[in-house]
């Protein structure tokens, strides 16, 4: 049972402020993807070097997720979360005014700290803001910020970059960060911390029954998804054979469906968490194998990809909810482990997917991706049954 929310009204305004923070963080994370060419030209570096701005953020986020709970164990979580939003603003300003590559990387490193830290503490913070039965709904609200940012960051960054320049785009991102900071300042309550948490707590949490298997299953799902997502464009080009407009429409459909999926996830998890955890990767696995087997019909492919997007939208909400119910006493440490597992899965899924793509093309990637997702569903069904049942 969550100790604060049982005695006080749900702090939905604070949850909304965290959603704004998520939107700002994820938007800033992916802006360089659509601005690589002008950034590289302006800083007199290659596009490959500019791309390291994304890599640096992900790497620092992974390390931060493992260390931040112990490093800030004596600090009120209100101030820690405000610090992350402050780092978001500073990061975007450093990038906007960066005269060279080191300055750019410094800004992106600060963003990685904010990103990894925020995700580590998000589930534990939600537990303090709303009653236990409202946690899935609150998490779905927060993850909707991810979906919106994913939809708008790249196209809007590219669009405004052409009109006002890439530096001004990052200045706008800094304004969004400042807005999130101000709303959080007005709405986040004081939240005491667990001063007993140490770095070794990570290992203690990992040794609890079924936690390790849960992290493995989550990593498999994210690896399978990002192997698919990384190579979706080559699939649409070579198998579905759509033009640029068709591709944009399909990807927009994926993003919109993903946004709806975050709210669907909250609805389903409030009714049956374990069933949701099993059905979603199983559905994604079937869709991956279906695209590999019968892909090539634009309308059918678009429908399956949209359904994949909606299904995946429930996944982050599901695993964050699982975390709050399985390790409620050390939700921050468990959150750090989950973030690290997901970041590693994203990197490994894309990397292994590249090897498979070179050998068997996009169809090969989708076949392996679908198989991994089905294995993850089986692992949850047979390996995590007792713990999840107890948690629900």
State what each model feature region is.
Residues 91, 102-110, 299-307:
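Paired small-residue
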Residues 107-145:
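Cytoplasmic helix-loop-helix junction between adjacent transmembrane helices
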Residues 326-362, 369:
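A late C-terminal transmembrane helix in Major Facilitator Superfamily
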Residues 63-99:
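Conserved MFS/SLC helix-loop-helix module at the cytosolic interface between two early adjacent transmembrane helices
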Residues 64-77, 261-273, 357:
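Helix-to-loop junctions at the C-terminal end of transmembrane segments
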Residues 275-319:
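C-terminal transmembrane helical hairpin of 12-TM major facilitator-type secondary transporters
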Residues 101-103, 132-134, 140-186, 235:
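Helix-loop-helix hairpin linking two adjacent transmembrane segments in secondary transporters
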Residues 44, 76, 97-103, 294-296:
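Helix-breaking motifs and short loop linkers at transmembrane-helix boundaries and internal kinks
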